[in-house]
């Protein structure tokens, strides 16, 4: 399958499934010679202004982006553009970043979780899936063994 995308965006959050998705994106971007962007969203509570100094969250974001840059290096991808954003909610921020930067493809990692007996994407991935205009690939983490019954 030939990848038509020239610009790929991967939202990251520091969780293992997010790192695996990013690693996969690095491999795809390297082979396709595509631009790769990573974004970490700091969700700022409504009680604070978006410009508030939330040093713990900023430090966490910097650590996550440093880890993402290390993964890109391990995967021999050069030219990663990684940054963090401040927003009220991650989903709308990722969609806006995708639109503003004219992304062709989003690769979104999601955890394996079941809610009410059904697999659930979670609110952020669901928002992105329903609102982004470019192509999207979901990378769900592997189910635990054995898979819980649906009873």
Give residue ranges: language-model regions.
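Structural beta-alpha unit
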Residues: 1-3, 73-106, 126, 146-151
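Small/aliphatic-rich secondary-structure junction motif
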Residues: 2-51, 74-75, 80, 131
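Short, well-ordered secondary-structure micro-motifs
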Residues: 21, 48-51, 92-95, 118-119, ...
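Short, solvent-exposed amphipathic alpha-helices that sit
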Residues: 24, 57-70, 93
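Acidic, proline/glycine-rich short linear motifs
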Residues: 39-63, 83, 146-151
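Short secondary-structure boundary segments
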Residues: 40, 109-111, 140-141
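Glycine-rich, Arg-bearing micro-motifs that act as flexible, cationic patches
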Residues: 108-131, 145-148
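Short, flexible loop segments at boundaries between secondary-structure elements
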Residues: 134-146
